[in-house]
Design a protein with these regions (language model features):
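N-terminal subdomain of nucleotide-sugar transferases
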Residues: 1-47, 68-70
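Short N-terminal targeting/anchoring amphipathic segment
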Residues: 60-80, 98
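Membrane-proximal helix-turn-helix segments that form the acceptor-binding/catalytic region
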Residues: 61-68, 92-93, 107-127
Length: 187
């Protein structure tokens, strides 16, 4: 399987840092494990924009112009994928979309916004959540169904931190560790 991997930051740099034990893998949302499962990612070319609309438009054109075939769009967030998701909801973007959703899907008090939002979520095929509570709260919105929501247990990259413990100099145990507070600056 080949996926288009979207992240809201420059990912190649972070992946290179991870390979050199300078960046924890859990921030890469599975990227470091995909190859073990036969998943081959195409990395999105990130570019920062202050405007969310310009950011979404840039991402839209980057994804649409991708020449390499892929089976699925995998996003670490929906932020910046809004145009693609709406196109999927309209049936104009054919690839399935799977994203991490970092908060519960909520119901809006404004009926028009709620209607638009319900349509928007039709453009997301699968969503990954960090807790069962977020899933349960999302189901209450009426915008998503249980079949598209998945609980993924996510935690620290223990291999990364074990490597740091083995390779960083040990603290001198005779001296007590000094705690610094932002209000106690040394001159």
């Amino acid at each position: 399987m080949k996926i288009y991997y979207y992240h809201t930051r420059p990912i190649q740099e972070a992946l290179d840092e991870w390979k050199n034990h300078l960046h924890p893998g859990h921030i890469l949302y599975g990227l470091t494990h995909f190859s073990k499962h036969g998943i081959h990612p195409i990395l999105h070319h990130y570019r920062h924009f202050a405007s969310r609309i310009r950011f979404s438009l840039y991402n839209f054109f980057e994804i649409i112009r991708c020449k390499e075939p892929y089976d699925l769009l995998y996003g670490t967030s929906f932020y910046g994928l809004e145009f693609i998701i709406f196109l999927r909801a309209f049936g104009l973007y054919r690839k399935p979309i799977a994203i991490w959703h970092h908060q519960a899907v909520v119901r809006n008090s404004n009926k028009l916004k709620n209607l638009i939002s319900r349509f928007y979520y039709r453009g997301i095929d699968q969503m990954f959540f960090f807790s069962q509570t977020l899933i349960e709260d999302s189901l209450k919105s009426g915008k998503v169904n249980a079949g598209q929501l998945h609980l993924i247990h996510w935690g620290a990259d223990l291999d990364f931190y074990d490597y740091l413990r083995q390779h960083l100099p040990a603290a001198n145990e005779e001296e007590p560790e000094k705690t610094y507070h932002y209000w106690e600056r040394e001159s």
